Amino acid sequence: MKKRASVRKICQKCRLTRRRGRIRVICSNPRHKKRQG
């Protein structure tokens, strides 16, 4: 999981979700996992 200042979708399977006030990217590819803040 990487922490980024800005998160966006990398591929078609990436999904942006909000958990506990943080924006996360969930994807079938583990390399695409990241959160904001």
Swiss-Prot record:
Protein name: Large ribosomal subunit protein bL36c
The encoding gene: rpl36
Keywords: Chloroplast, Plastid, Ribonucleoprotein, Ribosomal protein
Organism expressing this protein natively: Jasminum nudiflorum
Pfam families, per database record: Ribosomal_L36
GO cellular component, one term: ribonucleoprotein complex
SUPFAM superfamilies: Ribosomal protein L36
GO MF term (any one): structural constituent of ribosome
Compartment list: Plastid, Chloroplast
